[in-house]
């Protein structure tokens, strides 16, 4: 009787220790509990070996999921560290809206933004000259992170496209970029619609607040489907001030705008070159 009690206690203790290992592995990898348990069992409780097994299985799962249709997701605002680095909108896709709302998907969007910003800064914005090639390059850089996300989400995830903000050629000096994201869940700059606006400072060295730049981005997101001359539209939130007057009041002139809603074609406005 005493022997049976001892072995039962030992079995319970071993089970508890094993579950602690499962919890630790899940915390480190974010893989499903069932996958963590199976990997630890196969690795005889060796944490490092179990992580290697999960990584290999994640790659295999990613390969299987690679051809799955991705029709849901979010758009991501990416503004370079300096105006010369440029700005762009990344479209990130998943198979379901449920997965796109997952915290791991959202964090992977942030990782993609950080990597693209590094490329933009390193090339002084030149990487955006070929958006398709930029998307491919970013996908290659993000390969391991995307495979890890696929393993956690259990469905495909990919970088669909990169849309660059292209300033008007005749208005490329003293540029500033405003950004606004609509439909954010819990990560800034990741949402359903992103608006980027390039403006030029009239007075050099004047400090333009981030709130002012965000406001102009918000206006173009709110009015992206409007027809006609943007300068004569009422500024979003104002019944008396037009966009042109609002910009003049803040010492700015419009260069270009880019609004991207997930799943739709981007809306672009570019300042016309003045007549000679």
Swiss-Prot record:
GO process terms (BP): mitochondrial translational elongation
Listed InterPro entries: EF-Ts_dimer_sf, Transl_elong_EFTs/EF1B, Transl_elong_EFTs/EF1B_dimer, UBA-like_sf
Molecular functions (GO terms): translation elongation factor activity
Cellular component terms (Gene Ontology): mitochondrion
Main location: mitochondrion
Alphabetical UniProt keywords: Elongation factor, Mitochondrion, Protein biosynthesis
Protein location: Mitochondrion
Recorded superkingdom: Eukaryota
Function: Associates with the EF-Tu.GDP complex and induces the exchange of GDP to GTP. It remains bound to the aminoacyl-tRNA.EF-Tu.GTP complex up to the GTP hydrolysis stage on the ribosome.
Protein family according to the UniProt entry: Belongs to the EF-Ts family.
Note: This protein may be expected to contain an N-terminal transit peptide but none has been predicted.
Listed name of the protein: Elongation factor Ts, mitochondrial
Organism of derivation: Leishmania braziliensis
């Amino acid at each position: 009787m005493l022997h049976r009690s001892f072995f039962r206690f030992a079995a319970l203790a071993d089970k508890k220790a094993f579950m602690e290992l499962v919890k630790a592995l899940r915390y480190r990898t974010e893989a499903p509990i069932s996958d963590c348990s199976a990997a630890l069992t196969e690795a005889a409780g060796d944490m490092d070996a179990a992580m290697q097994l999960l990584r290999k299985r994640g790659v295999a799962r990613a390969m299987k999921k690679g051809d799955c249709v991705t029709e849901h997701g979010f758009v991501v605002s990416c503004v370079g560290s300096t105006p010369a680095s440029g700005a762009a909108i990344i479209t990130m896709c998943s198979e379901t809206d449920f997965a796109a709302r997952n915290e791991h998907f959202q964090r992977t969007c942030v990782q993609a933004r950080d990597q693209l910003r590094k490329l933009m800064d390193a090339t002084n914005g030149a990487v955006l000259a070929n958006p398709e090639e930029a998307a491919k390059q970013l996908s290659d850089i993000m390969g391991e992170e995307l495979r890890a996300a696929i393993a956690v989400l259990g469905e495909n995830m990919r970088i669909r496209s990169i849309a660059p903000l292209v300033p008007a050629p005749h208005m490329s000096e003293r540029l500033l970029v405003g950004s606004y994201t609509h439909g954010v869940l819990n990560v800034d700059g990741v949402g359903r619609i992103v608006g980027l606006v390039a403006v030029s400072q009239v007075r050099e060295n004047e400090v333009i607040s981030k709130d002012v730049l965000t406001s102009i981005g918000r206006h173009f997101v709110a009015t992206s489907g409007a027809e006609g001359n943007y300068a004569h539209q009422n500024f979003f939130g104002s019944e008396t001030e037009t966009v042109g007057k609002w910009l003049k009041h803040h010492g700015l002139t419009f260069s270009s705008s880019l609004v991207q809603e997930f799943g739709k074609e981007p809306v672009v406005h570019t300042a016309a070159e003045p007549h000679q």
